[in-house]
């Protein structure tokens, strides 16, 4: 799945219902001790088939801001 800044995604937050929001940032890890990619590269687009470590920042419809690892993204909506 290709994810782009501005896409709406569904994120597994280990609850009954996933959380949905708009991607505001994509970070790719460049070192093993930074799995979320906070100190890594910020990109505008990422293909999850590449299976890199990293994370997204996203904002819900009501303005709450969260982040999630790539592995938590369920789908692009």
Give the location of each predicted region:
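Short linear motifs in intrinsically disordered
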Residues: 1-2, 37-50
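Short polar/acidic secondary-structure junctions
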Residues: 14-15, 48
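Intrinsically disordered, low-complexity, charged/polar segments
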Residues: 46-77
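Serine/threonine-rich, low-complexity intrinsically disordered segments
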Residues: 4-5, 26, 32-33, 50, ...
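Short beta-strand-centered aromatic/proline hotspots
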Residues: 18-32, 40-43
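Short loop/turn positions at the edges of beta-strands in beta-sheet-rich folds
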Residues: 15-17, 62
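Short coil-to-beta transition motif at edge beta-strands of beta-rich domains
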Residues: 1-14, 22-24
